[in-house]
Design a protein with these regions (language model features):
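Short alpha-helical transmembrane segments in multi-pass integral membrane proteins
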Residues: 1-15, 69-133, 177-231, 288-355, ...
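Transmembrane helix-bundle signature of multi-pass secondary active exporters and lipid flippases
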Residues: 14-63, 67, 133-137, 224-290, ...
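Helix-loop interface residues and adjacent transmembrane-helix termini in multi-pass membrane transporters
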Residues: 26, 35-38, 72, 149-150, ...
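Structural signal for membrane-spanning alpha-helices in multi-pass inner-membrane proteins
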Residues: 29, 102, 145, 171, ...
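Membrane-helix interface/capping residues of multi-pass secondary transporters
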Residues: 29, 38-41, 153, 182, ...
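Small-residue-rich hydrophobic transmembrane alpha-helices
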Residues: 41-100, 137-156, 262-326, 359-378
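Hydrophobic transmembrane alpha-helices of multi-pass small-molecule transporters
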Residues: 53-56, 167-171, 197-201, 271-275, ...
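Short runs within selected transmembrane alpha-helices of multi-pass transporters and secretion channels
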Residues: 62, 129-148, 156-167, 185-200, ...
Length: 430
């Protein structure tokens, strides 16, 4: 199979898989909006940064270790087999604080994220359940990354889609027929990665599998080597959490809970958009790492060009749909028919999503830099878009233009980051 055909196979399957992952957040938002109105949407939006942090750690461990595994395997290095076990063991270590927070102080965490008394009372049960399942969220990222890098992207896609379908169906069953309310939504979300892991585990029993669990203690050295390549994935996932937290605080100050609920609509569709572009980056990663391990620089550059072109085309298609159907798209999560929320979300969608013309390229380029063992440059791109530029732009533009400035901060920060990314890519070629 040609490199181009392999690229489209890996990328398309990974996009579908990650879309499935984002769909269970959308399912939560829809059913919670039906059950609890704008307060429920505001609660979920306050919880999104916690999800992002959990996924960011899973991404750093999973993508970092799997990328290191793919490079070493292409070079015929037997040390590659130790990275899978090490990543799983460290996931359990990193998950422990989240589990303890879920057991002893979920209300403290919700207050820290900006929740008022109403939101905290509404969300304690929801937060407690999903925090207790943190190890499964993290391990799901690791298992799927290794299955994909071991040549089975189809199984990784099927596992993710099955987990997401379970979540959507049981969100409804747990919340309404069984009457569990918001804790039911959390339970459906929490169990879905367990199912995904179980399906992915079939790969490890195949004769073709080169990934296996090795009995060992957690190795800080292997962790550092993995995180070196996974830190861009960590920052990339965290960027959504940082953006959400900063925007929530600014919007609470500007217009209160209704504005946060409006941003909840924008943020949930942004999860889907980001999943699409992460699908391009993560789908190409095994192929780029393989080319790099075999010293095939031309093949790696070809994959970068394919990824960048794909990202631009997808950004144009995405914005055309969102611009053409903004009203109905906003109405999906506006069960109380709040005119003010609809007004805020309408302008938010149309301004915010302009940023994906730049964000798609930035995500693909950061994934490429990590896949070819250029972690410092990958981290610079991810840190710019995830923390430095977005925080600076949101503070400055919100002070100048109010709520529209908050929405415009995302496209402005991504445009700045795209300039930095182009500089980093060209500098290496000289």
């Amino acid at each position: 199979m040609s490199l181009t055909k392999q690229y489209f196979k890996y990328v398309s399957q990974n996009i579908f898989g990650l879309l499935g992952t984002s769909c269970y957040i959308l399912a939560d938002t829809y059913f919670i909006s039906q059950a609890s109105g704008t307060s429920g949407v505001a609660l979920l939006n306050l919880c999104l940064p916690i999800y992002n942090f959990i996924f960011a750690i899973g991404s750093m461990l999973g993508l970092g270790a799997a990328t290191r595994y793919a490079i070493l395997r292409a070079q015929g290095d037997e040390r590659s087999e130790r990275y899978f076990s090490n990543a799983l063991l460290w996931a359990l270590v990193f998950a422990l604080p989240f589990m303890l927070a879920g057991i002893f102080c979920p209300e403290v965490l919700l207050r820290f994220m900006g929740g008022d008394a109403e939101i905290v009372a509404l969300g304690v049960g929801y937060a407690r359940i999903f925090l207790l399942f943190t190890p499964f969220f993290m391990c799901n990222y690791i298992v799927s990354a290794f299955v994909r890098n071991d040549g089975d992207p189809s199984l990784a896609m099927v596992a993710t889609l099955c987990g997401s379908l379970f979540n959507v169906v049981f969100d409804y069953i747990f919340m309404f027929p069984m009457g569990l309310g918001l804790p039911g939504a959390a339970l459906a979300t929490a169990v879905s990665p367990v199912l995904s892991i179980a399906i992915c585990s079939r790969h490890f029993f195949k004769k073709s599998s080169t990934v296996r669990f090795v009995r060992q203690l957690p190795s800080p050295k292997l962790l550092a080597q993995s995180c070196q390549l996974g830190v861009s994935g960590f920052v990339g996932e965290m960027s959504s959490g940082v953006t959400t937290t900063v925007f929530n605080l600014l919007l609470l100050r500007l217009a209160g809970n209704v504005a946060v609920a409006a941003y909840g609509v924008v943020a949930n569709y942004a999860l889907v958009a980001t999943a699409i572009f992460n699908g391009v980056a993560q789908g190409a990663q095994p192929l780029v790492s393989r080319c790099y391990g075999k010293n095939d620089a031309a093949g790696a550059r070809k994959l970068l060009l394919l990824g960048s072109g794909t990202a631009l085309a997808l950004a144009a298609a995405l914005y055309a749909v969102l611009f053409g159907f903004t009203g109905p798209i906003v109405a999906v999560f506006n069960s109380e028919n709040s005119a003010l929320m609809a007004q805020y979300a309408f302008s938010g969608v149309r301004i915010y999503f302009l940023g994906y013309f730049f964000a798609g390229f930035n995500i693909v380029a950061a994934g490429y830099l990590g896949a070819v063992d250029r972690p410092a440059e990958a981290s610079a791109t991810s840190l710019s878009r995830g923390i430095v530029a977005i925080v600076a732009c949101s503070l400055v533009l919100s002070a100048l233009f109010g709520m529209n400035g908050v929405w415009a901060a995302f496209p402005a920060s991504e445009a700045i980051t795209a300039c930095l990314t182009l500089f980093l890519l060209k500098r290496k070629k000289r």
